[in-house]
Amino acid sequence: GEMARFITKEPDTAEILSDLTAKNAFVTRLPGGGYRFHHMMKACAQRDFDALPPQEQATYQARYGHWYAENGQYLQALAAYSKAGRWDDALEVVQQDAGILLAALRPQQVLELLDRCGDQVLMEHPTALLVLMRRMFTWGQIPRMQQLKALLLESVRNHPDMTPRQRGNLLGECDLIESFLHYNDITEMSRLHRSASRQMTDQAVSIQSRGSWTFGSPSVLMMFHRTPGQLSRELAEMDDCMPHYYKITGGHGMGAQRIMEGEAALAQGRLNDAAIALERARAAISGSGQENMALCCDFLEMRLHMAAGEAVGVDLRRRRQLLQQHNAMWLHIFDSTAAYCQAVLGRADDIPELFREHRLDTVNFLGPCLPMMQMIENQVYLAQGAYARVIGGSEGLLALCRGMHYALVELYVLVQTAAAYEKLGKRREAAELLRQAAALAQPDGLVTPLAENGRYLRELLPEYGTLGREAAELSRVLENGSRAARQQEQRPAAFAPLTEREWAVAQRMARRLSNREIAGQLFLTEGTVKQYINQIYSKLHLTGDARTKRRRLEELMGE
């Protein structure tokens, strides 16, 4: 009602809505106070709206934009202001969002927005230019990023009325954004961070602490381990540079250096040191509301449990909490960490749907996290036995990793591809790839990346010296976690006819979960769950009403 009152300026919207929705099969009242309209009704309403004079349409769209912006729904606000041709307002929304929700759009949508705004309007919004520069970097649109920088500098020159403080903040923040052109070269990035810090008296506007720090990557170490043999130096550089970055961004990415330290310790098999660094990271980010860093901590913690021989599950309560925040990136990070861990444990059915069904192409991942996502998908392919798919995609993925100086991700992909060749009986190819992987891992003693796929490579690993033997030993510990996971799901003989998916549904039915809860845990729709339940009853020859069949299924499970 509140939104309708604001958009229409009608005082009696409550009565109008009541009349429109009472006993109307085309409208459903939602628990939160909103409404769901049948697509036919929406089409009719849209047709009537399109018949209004253009100026009247623009007035309503501008009101939509204002309402959405005031309620933090920046993407909807941006769309509405664009339809109204209100480019100044659209750029104000870009500034307010600080590029956080903007990341969910396709790059082409934002490029079209820039073209429609025009340079003169853009130069009146220098802070929005900073936000757009950073987003262009994450989309790999570097020439456009440089064009926006030129507009920013021209804007500063054309506004002699700016105070020295305003000018310093804009130029300093420009240095901060330009540092991303040296992404994952910690020394060069820090040089520009220090330059920004010298010029800025206020905190950055284009980077907010509530936004993503890892661009969607679940790991800090995968982003910043650049050169084999230089891990200790990279950790020291990160320790040195982050305080300067925190100063000008209000603590954006707080705890990143501790997470990287913990991930490095885990990669080297120093589990106690990794656990200490993890707790320090959690203490650093406590109360900051930085979900990105908390999710990276979760990933480190799950892999620590696995390295200790424990099975880890998918924390669906945590996922529901993230879902309520309406930030797709947090969900994708969560799904990627769950996918990787469940794949390493060999629990293919528990892998989130985005990765299990290989739908990564439906998501607009930011460029810096794409190699990590594809590496995790590789791990899923291994768990599913799709070894040829791993091999087929490895050449392009390795080239991408090398081009971005992602030494750790490259190491993982080499090991995965070696595992795929070994499973297909191609020992010579597997040994050559494992030799390349060992050459990357040896200088820094990175044992865990080899161990996490050790169950595929156990016969080969001992041939690679102390590192290989340690990896083989750790892989046996990891196998305990896989064994524990399998024991948790050991299937009685009566359920032998069921597929893995049907068995997963049947287990949850026996635990008296509702269809909605089963759907949530297995990343299915309720309709699909009902189909599986009918198939289960048919295969197990269970008859009677729904309650009788469910009780009989529980009895079979007990037997």
Regions found by a protein language model. Give the residues of each.
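C-terminal boundary/linker of central alpha/beta nucleotide-binding cores
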Residues: G1-D50, T59-A62
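Amphipathic alpha-helical segments of tetratricopeptide repeats
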Residues: A22, L78, A98-G99, L114-D119, ...
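Extended alpha-helical scaffolding segments used for macromolecular assembly and cargo binding
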Residues: R47, A51-A128, L132-R135, L148
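Structural motif corresponding to the intra-repeat A-B loop/turn of tetratricopeptide repeats
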Residues: N71, A84, A104, W139, ...
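Alpha-solenoid helical repeat architecture
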Residues: Y74-Q76, R86-W87, H125, M162-G172, ...
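Internal alpha-solenoid helical repeat scaffolds
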Residues: V121-C297
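Linker/hinge segments immediately adjacent to helix-turn-helix/homeobox DNA-binding domains
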Residues: Q374-G396, L400-V409, L414-R427, A431-E500, ...
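Recognition helix of helix-turn-helix DNA-binding domains
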Residues: R512-R551
